[in-house]
Amino acid sequence: MNSGILQVFQRELICPICMNYFIDPVTIDCGHSFCRPCFYLNWQDMAVLAQCSKCKKTTRQRNLKTNICLKNMASIARKASLRQFLSSEEQICGTHRETKEMFCEVDKSLLCLLCSNSQEHRNHRHCPTEWAAEERREELLRKMQSLWRKMCENHRNLNMATNRIRCWKDYVSLRIEAIRAEYHKMVAFFHEEEQRHLERLQKEGEDIFQQLNESKARMEHSRELLRGMYEDLRQMCHKAVVELFQSFGDILQRYESLLLQVSEPVNPEFSAGPIIGLMDRLKGFRVYLTLQHARASSHIFLHGDLRSMKVGCDPQHDPNITDKSECFLQWGADFFISGKFYWEFNMGHSWNWAFGVCNNYWKEKRQNDMIDGEVGLFLLGCVKEDTHCSLFTTSPLVMQYVPRPTDTVGLFLDCEGRTVSFVDVDRSSLIYTIPNCSFSPPLWPIICCSHF
C-alpha cells in the first residue's frame, strides 16, 4: 500500500482526544468518533448533554454502542505497530536472534519461541504476545465499564444527598409542627410527652443532618478517586506492551481496593415515635370500607420514581412482575363529600403499594390508564429499591424519612380541613399529614398494591 494512503488510513483510526489508536470506539450522532473512555472523561457534567470535542455540537445519546468495525480496524493497526516494535533490534532475542512473539505469564517477560521451550520456561504458561496484549486491554475496558457504572451511581447518590441537605431543615420543621398539631388535638393534653417527643425529633434531625453532610463529603472524595482510577485504566490501555504486561496485575489490585473504599449513601430515617392517645382519637371516626372487586386486567401496579411518579404497571417492562405476581388497583365502593373519616388497610408482606384518596375526575377519566403525575391523588406510597424501601407522599411529591409500616396503615380524611393524614397503626405514630389538599369531591378511597 502507498505510504501516503497508509498514513491517511492510520489517521482515521486515531482518537482526536488521546491521539492514540481507538479503544472501544463510539460514534456520536454528529458523526465523530472517540474512544469511549475519552468521551466519558471529557463529559464533565453528567447532568447536562455531552458535547462533541471536535464540532462542539451537543449529543442526546447516552447509551452509546461500540463501533465494531472501527474497533476491529484499530486492533489490526495496533497489532501491526506491535509487530514493527517486536522486530526492532532492541527487541530481538539476544540468544537466538528471533522475534519475541511469546509472553510468559509467570515472569511477565517477552520470549522468542525457542526460549519459551527452554528448560527455564518449559513449565510456564505462554501465549502469543499480540493476543495477550489485546486480551489485557479488553480486561481493562471491562473494568472501566464497571467503574463508569459506579461513577454514575455515585453521581446520582451525590445529587440525592445534595437535595436532601438543601431540604432537610424545612422537612424537620414541618414534621415537628405536624407532631405538635397532633398532640394539640387530644382531649387530654400530654404536655411532658409532647416536649420529650419534639426534643427527640429535633435531636434526631440534627444528627441526621450531620450524617448527610459527612456522607456527601465521602461521596465527593469517592468521585475523585473513581475518576482518577478511570483515567489510570485508560492510560494503561495505551501503554507500550512491556509496561502493560508488567503493570497489569498492580493496577487490577488498585482497582479492587478502590471498590471497597467507595462510600454508600446514608438512608436517613427518623425513629417511629408513638403519640399517646393518637389511635384512640382516630378510631372515633372509624369507617369500614368495601372495595370494588374488579381487578384491573392490565395488572395495575405502582412504580415510584420520585421525579415522575406513575401508578399502573406494565408486565413486559418490569422484571419483578411474573405470572404469579398479584397486582391490582381498586377503589372503595363508597365516596366522601364532607366530614371526618378514618380507615385502615393491611399491607401484609407487600413492599410496593400506594394508599389514599383521589378526586372523582381522576377516577372517572383515568381508571383504565397508566397514570403519569399526581394531580388529584393524595397518596402514601412505598416502593422497594433493592433491599431498601422508600416512602413518599403526593400532592406535592415528598420523600418521607420514617420506617416502613410493618403491617397496617391508617388514613384520616378531614374534608373541611382539607388534610389527609397517614399513620403507622402498629407503632401508633404519624407518618405524614398532607396539608391544603385540592379536593374536588366526591373523594374516593384508592389502593394500589402488588404481591410477588
UniProtKB/Swiss-Prot annotation:
It comes from the Eukaryota. Keywords: Metal-binding, Zinc, Zinc-finger. InterPro entries: B30.2/SPRY (IPR001870), B30.2/SPRY_sf (IPR043136), Butyrophylin_SPRY (IPR003879), ConA-like_dom_sf (IPR013320), SPRY_dom (IPR003877), TRIM/RBCC (IPR050143), Znf_B-box (IPR000315), Znf_RING (IPR001841). SUPFAM superfamilies: B-box zinc-binding domain, Concanavalin A-like lectins/glucanases, RING/U-box. A zinc finger (B box-type) spans 88-129. Zn(2+) binds at residues 93, 96, 115, 121. A zinc finger (RING-type) spans 15-56. Residues 269-452 form the B30.2/SPRY domain. It holds the Pfam family SPRY. One of its GO terms (cellular component) is cytoplasm. One of its GO terms (molecular function) is zinc ion binding. One of its GO terms (biological process) is regulation of gene expression. Belongs to the TRIM/RBCC family. This is Tripartite motif-containing protein 51G. The lineage of its organism: Eukaryota, Metazoa, Chordata, Craniata, Vertebrata. The gene is TRIM51G.
